Amino acid sequence: MILYELIKVLRYARVNREVKNKVYLDEATGLPNKNKCEEILTLEAEQNMSICVFDLNNLRIIDNQQGHERGDFYINSFAKNLRKGVDENQFVGRCGGDEFIAFFKNVTKEDVKRNLENIKKECTKCSEIPLSYPAGFAYSNDFFKINNARIVLSGR
């Protein structure tokens, strides 16, 4: 009887993990998805943090001219290079489509700039397809910009 209950608990734990992954992970990139980005933004907005928003250029053109498979490759290439370019202990996620976000906790402006340079370096290493993106960032004491980031995430 105890073994049966233990098996049930383990099975429920696995199912909960799978559901959580589906709710919070972007299947295409393996990065946290818009739901997780919104949750982090809501929970962390009061703390000392910076927010960087990235918007891939030319995704629609790539999709239309080279096909969605190539567009998916473009998105995945950027996602991998974004993750490589940002310090391991910082958060990066995909908000949807061609939009990505990074949250930096307890960092200086110089740290953010260094991470942005690292992302740029990683993206230039991708020789198979040129990665192009504008990036903007705000600091936690700039509530107007953070509110704008929330609006972007909510799709308004």
Regions found by a protein language model. Name each.
Residues N21-Y24, G30-S50, N57-D87, G93-G97, ...:
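Conserved long alpha-helical elements within nucleotide-processing catalytic cores of c-di-GMP signaling
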Residues L31, L56, V107, A138-S140:
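Hydrophobic pocket-lining residues within nucleotide cofactor-binding pockets
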Residues S50, F103, E128-R156:
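A short glycine-enriched loop-to-beta-strand structural element that forms part of the catalytic core
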Residues K84-N89, N118-P130:
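Short catalytic/binding micro-motifs of nucleotide second-messenger systems
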